[in-house]
Amino acid sequence: MNRAPLALVLPLVVACAARSAAPPSAAAGRDLRLPQERHLANVRQLTFGGENAEAYFSFDGRELIFQSTREGRACDQEYVMGADGSSPRLVSTGKGRVTCGYFFPGGDRILYASTHETSPGCPPPPDMSHGYAWALYDYQLYVARADGSDLHPLAQAPGYNAEATISVDGWIVFTSTRDGDLDLYKMRLDGSGLVRLTDTPGYDGGAFFSADGKRIVYRASRPKDAQELAQYRALLAQKLVRPTQLEIWVMDADGKNQRQVTHLGAASFAPFFHPDGRRIIFASNVGDPKGRNFDLYLVNDDGSGLERITYNETFDGFPMFSPDGKKLVFASNRNGSRPGETNVFIADWVE
């Protein structure tokens, strides 16, 4: 559930309406790069229709796993397609709400979070009467073959268990409320060796390993005073979290040397290491005084050298570099068939 933080992109992750996928348009072969986007070339749209996001490369860079409401689905399910957008196919159960798919090293298995056992239908959206918040559904982690077969649960615990990604050397990092807060944990691919990585009050999530598996980048909220902490805990008791203040953090893969990278005072999320291990790409609304528009930014891992990457007037988010660093996949509202439609795009990365 590496969600986009504000109501502008709410249909992407919370109130998905049933829609059927539209056929590819001329955009499939047209460069959708904006003039200011000097680090991007050959921006191509890979999905058309429905809501599509959180597309992540396989370790060989040949395939993408992503979540979508295509085929008239009311809730996100997981799909796999070629890195060129070819042959999309359902790999989750078609029940409940599904999020955060990821490939195992080797590409023969996948991991995702789903509510299909606790809520076979779409779980209800959160009550927004007290302000915008994310619902912490009762997600559990599941492992399956790459075609969706042989499904089984992994490291089950009551509450929220999601936002799982995998390192090249066979570790899973994920967010869970199993100890009462939204913290990061890691474990082996079979669920053994479970270790809690964070224990500071606040939301720690959206974690990814560096290419060598030695470090983790993640987003975090940190209540600044007793009042904010009380508000955070009150929402958590209702299975909600408010994501309006998120910063990017890094730590060693064992949880040591936790360090805040950004100090933007904004909603910054979806961080991912460049394969060089020195730079981090992420999404943020820091450039919009109204907090509604999200773009991609690049920053050095020490917080220096902040650079804006995309200049779309609506939403760009969920960036991921290909393993060789030559491609960037991301989700965007650009070129939608209707306002707010989110699709998956791929671009050449230009240094």
Language model region names:
Residues 7-15:
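Bacterial N-terminal signal peptides
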Residues 23-41, 139:
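Blade/loop signatures of beta-propeller domains
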Residues 31-33, 41-74:
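Beta-strand-rich domains and repeat architectures in extracellular enzymes and scaffolds
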Residues 48-51, 68-78, 93-98, 113-140, ...:
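A flexible loop/linker signature enriched in serine peptidases of the S9 family
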Residues 59-60, 105-106, 167-168, 211-212, ...:
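Residue-level detector of Asp-centered blade-edge/turn motifs that repeat once per structural unit
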Residues 64-65, 110, 172-173, 216, ...:
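Hydrophobic beta-strand positions that form the internal "hydrophobic ladder"
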Residues 82-86, 145-149, 188-192, 252-256, ...:
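Short loop/turn segments that connect beta-strands within beta-propeller blades
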